[in-house]
């Protein structure tokens, strides 16, 4: 969540979430940037990427759409990441900009495999890659996942503006940014 300049800068980076798990968008992907990895997880529906032969590739063909059901893919992605971790590998998971689809899988992985709450997992990933912002539909699915895992939830979907749903963990950031913009523009 931030200005278009920061989004542009951050979307061209590969973010290290764990020593074995990295998150990115398409922009920084080159044969050279892929050399350190043993596996890539491609979360772009229309992109069948040619990958260097040393890479294991998992393609999760999903759209960044609130109606996209991620539940059939949770365990496939988590198992792939864990297998790579156990074998000393490094996984790069990416989507178009590294903001919604791939970020959702990384946050959900931390919830499931590292026993973090949704709020804590989201905040941790956001501290590393501040542009993450899973869409509301993906947040709803992570809230359901958290409920299944822990019989409680730490994030709620709120409607602060008539008809607009926002995760409460995101709303304060949005509100603060809007107020900063108003203050800067003197309005």
Question: Can you say where each PLM-predicted feature lies in the sequence?
Answer:
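Glycine-rich nucleophile elbow surrounding the catalytic serine of serine-hydrolase chemistry
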Residues: 99-104
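Glycine-rich, flexible N-terminal cofactor/catalytic loop recognition
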Residues: 8-50, 54
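PTP/DSP superfamily signal
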Residues: 2-3, 79-90, 106-187
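Residues that form ligand- and interface-recognition hot spots within folded domains
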Residues: 25-27, 44-49, 61-66, 95-97, ...
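Short coil/turn segments at secondary-structure boundaries
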Residues: 35, 52-55, 72, 105-107, ...
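Beta-strand cores of modular interaction/reader domains in eukaryotic scaffold and signaling proteins
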Residues: 16, 22-23, 39-42, 56-61, ...
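Helix-loop module immediately N-terminal to the HCX5R catalytic loop
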Residues: 58-91
């Amino acid at each position: 969540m931030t200005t278009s300049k920061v989004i542009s800068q951050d979307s061209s980076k590969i973010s290290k979430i764990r020593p074995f798990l990295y998150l990115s968008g398409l922009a920084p992907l080159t044969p050279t940037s892929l050399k350190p990895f043993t596996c890539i997880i491609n979360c772009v529906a229309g992109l069948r990427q040619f990958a260097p032969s040393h890479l294991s590739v998992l393609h999760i063909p999903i759209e960044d759409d609130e109606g996209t059901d991620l539940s059939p893919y949770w365990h496939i992605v988590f198992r792939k990441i864990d297998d790579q971790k156990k074998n000393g590998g490094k996984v790069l998971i990416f989507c178009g900009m590294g903001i919604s689809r791939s970020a959702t899988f990384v946050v959900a992985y931390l919830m499931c495999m590292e026993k973090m709450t949704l709020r804590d997992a989201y905040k941790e990933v956001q501290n590393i890659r501040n542009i993450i912002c899973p869409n509301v539909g993906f947040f709803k699915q992570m809230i359901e996942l958290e409920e299944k895992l822990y019989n409680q939830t730490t994030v709620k979907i709120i409607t602060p503006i008539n008809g607009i749903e926002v995760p409460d963990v995101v709303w304060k950031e949005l509100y603060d940014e809007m107020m900063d913009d108003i203050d800067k523009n003197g309005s």
